[in-house]
Amino acid sequence: MATNTHNSLDDIFGSSPPHEHEHEHHQHQDLHPQPPPTQAPEPSDLPSLRRQHVTAGYRDGISAAKGAQVQRGFDAGFPVGAQLGMRAGTVLGILEGLVRGYEGRGGVKKPAQLQRGKTASSATEGQGEGDAEAAERKARREEILRLYTRAVKELDVRAVFSGVDGAFATEGDEEEKPEILLRQKGDGVVSRWEERVRVAHWEENMDALEPRDKEEEEEKALSEQS
């Protein structure tokens, strides 16, 4: 049997020599190489699932980091704000008390005004002194009211801590931590008002009045019991 005879199984096992048109096709591919096959397209659900997981991970990361940072910021900033807030409140309370005191306080009556049967000249003189005191008291009240209005504006939390945004350094720098910068900035503003209002003088007077108030309360309680 000749070797070049066609075998019925050549189409299956490929033992027959290549056909002429197949040889020409391979030569054409060698002369013009084909680009590598592209990656198979992903199923349509994968991009959507990937975006969902990226978004969920991003939100979880923000929530975890936010909780840690907020708690740390609260622990460091709350004592500073509470201390400065109490000092600023003391300044405003003193000024507000003075304004109300001058507003509701009547003129001081002289003994001559309380006596009957005084001459017309004495009554006129006493009335003139009362008018002068009322005018002086009114001017003093207006002066304190202007000072109080200015203090309310300058002791506002945004005004006290203005100018420190973005000036925070790294956590390792002890001298430039945010709470230290806030304390320094706020202390300078509040201290100037404490000196202007003489807070120390008022606190001494309040400390002196506290024992009297306690004694009066005790006496009142004893009288009610009896």
Curated annotation (Swiss-Prot):
**Keywords on record:** Cytoplasm, Nucleus
Positions of region (deca-GX3 motif)? 57-97
Q: Does the keyword Cytoplasm apply?
A: yes
Task: Kindly name one Pfam family recorded for this protein.
Answer: Yae1_N
Coiled-coil intervals: none
Q: What is a single cellular component term in the Gene Ontology annotation?
A: cytoplasm
InterPro entries assigned: Essential_protein_Yae1_N (IPR019191), Yae1-like (IPR038881)
Q: Where is the composition biased (Basic and acidic residues)?
A: 18-31
In which compartments does the protein localize? Cytoplasm; Nucleus
The ranges of region (Disordered) come to: 1-53, 105-136
Q: Name one GO biological process term.
A: protein maturation
Family, according to the entry, reads as follows: Belongs to the YAE1 family.
What does the record give as the function of this protein? The complex LTO1:YAE1 may function as a target specific adapter that probably recruits apo-RPLI1 to the cytosolic iron-sulfur protein assembly (CIA) complex machinery. May be required for biogenesis of the large ribosomal subunit and initiation of translation.
* Subunit-level organization: May form a complex with LTO1.
Q: What is this protein called?
A: Protein yae1
